[in-house]
């Protein structure tokens, strides 16, 4: 997905063992748009994000990414290997749990998406660390950082390879209100600077209020 791609979700449905999680989900995300997804606990918001990234399989409907030149990538047409390669190149992730590797220093953690693409770019890694206010901490280990600093590492890592789409699942859920607001400031500043689209799952009214659009996921579809 380039920075100018459109995400289109059509009639998406997912169930586990015959039990519906969600159904008839339709929405689109325009290039550079920030969309917040809210909804009751257990309605499948995190599962939906996993489907958007091709990490989880859905049962009905389509997920399509259309580039500015009109080239469409339909995730259902990609096998597991092709999906993984596509995801590594075009999607970034930020989660409530930071998922940093404790045996790697901060700079090495940020560089992971580039490494998976077979790239080495120390200058880009340093630029992202500078952008999130951790420029002097690249050699530190994750256990030496605070929760807010770890989420900054996660943001830098998610955007270091310039993805067109950032998927964020409760990225401020473990943070105090002041730190959460600072992390949201940083997340929005960096995605907008890169022209990336942002899809955010959140229970935070404060975070959702900053979105271009707020969608509510229900068992029977998307509202908003």
Role assignments for model-derived ranges:
Residues 5-7, 12-218:
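ABC family nucleotide-binding domain
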């Amino acid at each position: 997905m380039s920075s100018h791609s459109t995400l289109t979700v059509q009639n998406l449905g997912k169930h586990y063992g015959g039990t519906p999680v969600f159904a008839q989900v339709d929405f689109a995300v325009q290039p550079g748009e920030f969309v917040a997804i809210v909804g009751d606990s257990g309605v499948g918001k995190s599962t939906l994000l996993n489907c958007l990234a091709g990490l989880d399989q859905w049962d009905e409907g389509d997920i399509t990414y259309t580039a500015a030149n009109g080239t469409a990538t339909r995730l259902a047409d990609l096998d597991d290997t092709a999906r993984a390669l596509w995801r590594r190149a075009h999607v970034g992730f930020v989660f409530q749990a930071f998922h940093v590797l404790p045996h790697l220093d901060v700079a090495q953690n940020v560089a992971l998406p580039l490494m998976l693409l077979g790239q080495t770019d120390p200058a880009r890694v340093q630029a992202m660390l500078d952008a999130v206010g951790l420029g002097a901490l690249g050699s530190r280990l994750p256990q030496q950082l605070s929760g807010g600093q770890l989420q900054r590492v996660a943001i830098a890592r998610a955007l270091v390879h310039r993805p067109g789409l950032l998927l964020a699942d409760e990225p401020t859920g473990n943070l105090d209100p002041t730190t959460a607001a600072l992390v949201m400031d940083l997340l929005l500043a960096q995605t907008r600077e890169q022209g990336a689209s942002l899809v955010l799952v959140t229970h935070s009214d404060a975070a959702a209020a900053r979105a271009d659009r707020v969608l509510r996921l229900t068992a029977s579809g998307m509202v908003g």
